[in-house]
A protein has these predicted regions:
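C-terminal catalytic lobe of FAD-dependent flavoproteins
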Residues: 2-134
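Glycine/proline-enriched, intrinsically flexible loops and inter-domain linkers
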Residues: 87-88, 93-314
Length: 314
């Protein structure tokens, strides 16, 4: 439903329009619309298969109305008929949001997104609304150590560690179309791991346990690399029907029919939905398969660098 017209809200803009186009003053208002605008927390619409359902598709959340209708209709048809679009649609996928998203989060991020529509955007800028929604157990220690956080899939993750006395606007003020103040800190961290050793909080990565009598056959079909032996680890990919990359997985084989899968932290609901639907489709062929999302249950640290073994030996 539309709201009552409130010209006072647009008086400044209306007068500016008349100044720019004087004929508008004589023509007057012929019609009016005052209604809500659809927004999503990141400003992108929701386009693609609905999570957890089959043959259910979403195309909503368009903040600029019908302007994307032609393109969305084309790529939606490709997904429905061919199983995927000819371009990467991940940034619009409805599953980029998970069960962690609260009503308050949606409201505050939508307001923030609306406020930034016509503001200059810098590369990799981070926006503060709803900071701290999802954090690892090490969050307070990281913050005390100067961590400058970015937000992915609701998680606060350290982008880099800045000066201990940095104020809350340090990262925002360091963003630029050139090298910002963050540059030297990121370089130092990369050099430390490349030449020495470093500790990485990987808690926000997506984590699944796949097990059951059909797990080995299923993952052998689902991924394109040879599965590791028990107690070993390898890198592999799940592919689309046309052979392009769908998801990158690190697989740890904990038992004959039990596997621990790690994938990108940004796509937990996306990967979980794909895994579950694929397992359901193949259960009759391969046998019983369990899929457990343990992302929120397990905290993870990774230690990396050429001096890793000497640290672990102490």
């Amino acid at each position: 439903d539309l709201f009552p017209l409130n010209l006072e809200r647009i008086e400044d803009q209306y007068m500016a329009m008349i100044h720019r186009m004087p004929s508008c003053e004589e023509s007057g208002l012929k019609d009016d619309f005052n209604g809500p605008i659809c927004y999503t927390p990141d400003g992108n619409p929701l386009v693609g298969p609905a999570p957890g359902l089959r043959n259910m598709w979403l195309a909503e959340g368009f903040s600029f109305g019908i302007t994307a209708a032609g393109g969305v209709g084309n790529y939606m048809a490709q997904m429905m008929v061919n199983g995927e679009a000819e371009i990467d649609m991940a940034s619009l996928d409805p599953k980029r949001y998970g069960s962690w998203m609260t009503t308050e989060y949606a409201a505050r991020k939508n307001e923030e997104c609306y406020d930034h529509v016509y503001i200059l955007h810098h590369p990799d800028e981070e926006r503060p609304a709803c900071a701290g929604l999802r954090t690892s157990p090490a969050y307070d220690r990281q913050k005390a150590a100067g961590a400058q956080f970015g937000r992915v899939n609701g998680w606060d993750r350290p982008n880099y560690f800045g000066p201990l006395d940095a104020d809350e606007n340090f990262d925002h003020d360091s963003r630029s179309f050139r090298r910002g103040k963050w540059w030297k800190y990121a370089v130092d961290e990369a050099k430390a791991i490349r030449e020495g050793v470093g500790l990485i909080d990987a808690t926000a990565f997506t984590k699944h346990v796949v097990k059951g009598p059909g797990a080995t056959q299923f993952l052998d079909w689902f991924t394109c690399n040879k599965l590791p032996k028990v107690g070993r680890i390898n890198l592999t990919y799940a592919l689309t029907g046309s052979g392009t990359t769908r998801t990158e997985y690190t697989i740890v084989r904990n038992g004959e029919n039990e596997y621990y899968l790690v994938s990108a932290g940004a796509w937990t609901a996306y990967d979980s939905d794909y895994l579950r639907k694929a397992a359901e489709d193949k259960a009759a062929e391969f046998g019983y398969i369990e899929i457990h999302d343990v992302t929120n249950q397990w905290g993870v640290f990774a230690i990396a660098g050429p001096k890793t073994r000497s640290v672990l030996s102490k």
